[in-house]
Regions:
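C-terminal motif of bacterial Sec signal peptides marking the signal peptidase cleavage site
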Residues: 20-23
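Hydrophobic helical h-region of N-terminal Sec-dependent signal peptides
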Residues: 14-18
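Surface-exposed acidic/polar loop and edge beta-strand patches at domain peripheries
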Residues: 3, 25-229
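Bacterial N-terminal signal peptides that target proteins for export
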Residues: 2-12
Length: 229
């Protein structure tokens, strides 16, 4: 049975917030890689950048460590615009990482990765038999879940691509951007996307999505984090 997408989305935007408990002053923790550069004044918000390894295709990846004025920490990587770590205080005030993930890009490219923390799409979830009809035209997608298309498909799924990163001037956010060309994984239209992770001073981790396309196409982006609480 075909999956219809009758609605044209020219612009799609969404926001997700994770409310985090108030933090005590944290003990220091090791970063995933040695910082290469840092934004911030050292007394409040800060963003540190470090290498995260090379992909199998030889592309360099980076990891960004966001720290808010209360000491909470979030780590995100250019590979898949992925949330790698989120450090929160436990009942004793000690920081613990509550996100399941890997220490480098090799882990995310391995067989054991079940979309940990990544940005999934162009369409998250399954499209039955890898087919859909839009405006009277049938499209055939890459299949990667038996006969179905799952979380954007194969090697060019958003979760498997290296995104460009831009830290914010206020050291509270990192914006990842990517352009998926017309026909990639079988989808119509050139799709330009931005995913922004913001760690606020109110102890919120916010994820904002923006997508624009030049052709009718389905878009349904999300984050696939696993929480170890």
């Amino acid at each position: 049975m075909q999956t219809p997408f009758p609605t044209l989305f020219k612009t799609a935007a969404a926001a997700a917030s994770i409310l985090i408990m108030n933090a005590c002053s944290p003990a220091s923790e090791d970063n995933a890689g040695q910082p290469e550069s840092e934004t911030g004044d050292g007394d409040s918000n800060a963003i540190a950048k470090a290498g995260f390894g090379e992909t199998k295709a030889g592309e360099a990846t980076e990891i960004y460590t966001l720290t808010n004025k209360n000491g909470l920490i979030a780590k995100v990587t250019t590979y898949g615009a992925t949330l790698v770590e989120l450090h929160l205080p436990d009942k004793d005030g000690n920081l613990v990482d509550v996100i399941n993930g890997f220490d480098n890009v090799a882990g995310y490219e391995g067989e054991g990765n079940q979309y940990f923390g990544c940005t999934t799409g162009r369409v998250c979830n399954r499209i039955a038999k890898g087919k859909f009809t839009l405006d009277g035209e049938e499209y055939t997608l890459a299949t990667n879940n038996d006969p179905n298309h799952l979380h954007g498909g194969g090697d060019k799924a958003l979760s498997k691509q290296v995104w460009k990163a831009e830290p914010s001037a206020d050291a509270q956010a990192v914006t990842f951007s990517l352009i998926s060309p017309d026909g990639e994984e079988g989808y119509p239209g050139n799709l330009s996307m931005k995913v922004t992770y913001t760690l606020t001073d109110e102890n919120e981790l916010r994820i904002d999505y923006e997508a624009t396309t030049d052709k009718a196409t389905p878009v349904n982006l999300t984050n696939h984090a696993y929480f170890n609480l």
